[in-house]
């Protein structure tokens, strides 16, 4: 659930009293994280407001389309969609936080709130960052050519015997803990047989199978943005995919698995149906880029939970 305190929605405004308070479910399927951390190519809306002179504060938890203290809804979440963070998810203090925010910005009462981002990792740990995604991420590129493709390289089309047409790619395990924090990129070469086609990618822990995040793209929008670039049947293009915001700790010894289908979650299948499969190229030039951070625990936030 997203909550705003804002007097001007244009991030280009640089003068006057402007502020934004964001309460966001990192597993929200309605107001999804990309509406907060996405934007046009090269833009992260959350950071764009900060850079434009807004006072911005965020509480970013692993709940779905719920309020931070909506316990009954939190109890119904599934694995890979917030369950692993459930024991430390509920924020009983969020309404008090909101009250103090508006007391200061609407009435001038009380101290100025800290302009930070409180982010919950997928295993439940809360911490305080200056912004999110953090500014100090280090990008780690993984060539899909170094990963294992389990046979198929077509997304969509007529179902194969025994199930739907999907592509499964498993990448090597990491030799140390890996903390993903931000918008994972997948720049993948692909070819269409039709003026259309769609790829939905679910990222999983290769050992446990737990969902980490997802991305989806219509190949006609392969360059990103809101307007279709279009595609010529048989043409190879680079699908510049970006995952919904992820804050996840992948333990040493585990790797990443990518499962590619035509649709997933609540996204609609392509209108062209089985007539528009997409050939994905699991090769060296297709790159998965992970934004990684290293934290020592000094910015961990302890939150009260029910007994």
Regions from the language model: what does each represent?
Residues 22-24:
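Short beta-strand/loop motif that positions the catalytic acidic residue
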Residues 94, 103-307:
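Glycine/threonine-rich phosphate-binding loop and adjacent beta-strand/alpha-helix elements that clamp
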Residues 65-87:
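Catalytic histidine-centered segment of alpha/beta-hydrolase-like enzymes
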Residues 49-67:
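Catalytic histidine neighborhood in serine/cysteine hydrolases
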Residues 2-19:
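Short, small-residue-biased leader/transition segments that mark boundaries at the very start
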Residues 29-43:
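Conserved alpha/beta-hydrolase "acid-adjacent" motif
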Residues 26-28, 63:
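Acidic beta-to-alpha connecting loop that harbors the catalytic carboxylate
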Residues 41-44, 93, 97-101:
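Extracytoplasmic/secreted proteins, especially bacterial periplasmic and envelope-associated proteins
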